[in-house]
């Protein structure tokens, strides 16, 4: 009788690499229980699925759908993205520091036999270096790829949760980009709130990044999600000469107020961004139709996008607050979700795409709109089950929308799209620099 075993192709690899998991040695038609457990920042996350072995006594997770379990349908990485925290409400997906790999233990059981294997997900490839940045008034972390370079660069900004987006920076560096994760609030030495953030701070970040890494082809892209998606479009339009490309995850087409990340003394209808010391006009300002009621009222979890949609009915306020994306002087990528619970990123992205088409934007414009997905588009092969959360600044219990399976698809497809987009953008910049 064959011994039960689990094999994992590419058991130790970057987090964005799909693994091929197979179980062999079961009896034909036998039920096989498979579990996946991963400690994440001290909290155990777990998923499980029950399969029926084929005529050869094997289970192939890419080929076979579970008959029950944490996910449905054939999906080679389903046991990772369908994980939930055990006896915890944690939403922390990564270890601290993020350079510590995520180690998943796989266990298969038939009732009479057991097998175990593991897979390791790295955010930082071998040779990637990490450097904390606390200079020129900037707060962030710089990740550099292995090798001497020069490398094209990306500056990453977070959304309304604030802080330093080290996981995304580490993965960008692992894929060949000098990646600077720049905090602008809720980080050491910075305000705990998003209100009254000067755009000149980010210009200083762009200048520091160029001076420090001397990027290949002078290429510096911006990458941001949510409020950071709004921000990178705004920065691309404001400091156009300094921005080589823009990647906006679930972005806005408009300048918004402080919202959930506001300073309570300023209020959620107060300004977020300053330029030259003056607040930028935001969509809630003197808006005749905007109402917080659809977000505030009713039971938890709340959907912030319902309030955001009320502001779109005032055409004059919309026009005043629109980000002038036509001023961007490089390629633009937009990633949105049709069931975004935080704000209507699909509607916003279409507005941006349509404006760029209207002015015949001379650079590459890509828009990936993910059906049934929610606000939390990250990168491949992380859990997508925690849809409801308390906002990290306001504490308001909300839903980001979507569902685990479609959010997992968006995670995987978006990252491949972004890597291909940036590769084209770097090549275009390099070609333009040729004599």
Residue ranges and their predicted role:
Residues 151-152, 331, 365:
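Alpha/beta-hydrolase fold active-site loops
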Residues 347-350, 359-435:
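C-terminal catalytic histidine-bearing segment of alpha/beta-hydrolase fold enzymes
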Residues 35-86:
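Ser/Thr-rich low-complexity repeats and stalk/linker segments
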Residues 163-167, 204-285, 306-318, 327, ...:
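Primarily recognizes the serine-hydrolase "nucleophile elbow" in alpha/beta-hydrolase
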